[in-house]
């Protein structure tokens, strides 16, 4: 998926703002099992998934609990680091070799300060993530494992 399509899927930007944001990303490739973000670590980069699948998981009672799958077109943004300067609550791992668009969080913060359209794009992404979070977490609390996976599979369609 093209980076401009991914960006505009979240919030349509004027062409000059889109060009500025696109000019700040670079295409990278990482192998299966690579960790984009790690639990309890402050992160420095954000990613748009061009090709591939990732999962987000946390540890509970010495077990990995997967609660989100990202796929082509999704954004992997470390919101806790970006908004509060905290370590992340989850690890994000590649489930296959992936092609990603990468942007430094420091650069993203600069863009938020200097371009109101990009700042609104970031706000819109955060709003969508906040709305989606309870939907992702609820099945973890209330469903049996098989039912939970069926529900998550449904979200990926």
What is each stretch, according to the model?
Residues 9, 34-95:
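Cyclic nucleotide-binding regulatory domains
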Residues 13, 62, 114-117:
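Alpha-helical structural elements of signaling/regulatory helical domains
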Residues 27, 69, 91, 100-102:
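Conserved hydrophobic/aromatic beta-strand scaffold that supports enzyme active sites
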Residues 7, 22, 41, 97, ...:
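Generic anion/oxyanion-binding catalytic loop in active/binding sites
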Residues 1-27, 31, 81:
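Cyclic nucleotide-binding regulatory module and flanking cytosolic helices
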């Amino acid at each position: 998926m093209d980076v401009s399509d991914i960006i505009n899927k979240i919030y349509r930007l004027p062409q000059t703002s889109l060009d500025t944001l696109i000019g700040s990303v670079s295409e990278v490739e990482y192998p299966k099992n690579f960790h984009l973000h790690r639990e309890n670590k402050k992160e420095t980069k954000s990613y748009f998934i061009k090709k591939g699948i990732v999962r987000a998981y946390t540890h509970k009672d010495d077990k990995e609990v997967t609660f989100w799958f990202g796929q082509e077109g999704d954004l992997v943004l470390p919101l806790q680091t970006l908004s509060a300067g905290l370590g992340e609550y989850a690890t994000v791992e590649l489930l296959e070799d992936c092609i990603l668009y990468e942007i430094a969080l420091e650069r993203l913060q600069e863009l938020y300060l200097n371009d109101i359209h990009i700042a609104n794009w970031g706000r819109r992404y955060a709003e969508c993530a906040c709305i989606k979070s309870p939907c992702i977490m609820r099945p973890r609390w209330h469903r049996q494992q098989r039912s939970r996976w069926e529900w998550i599979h449904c979200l990926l369609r």
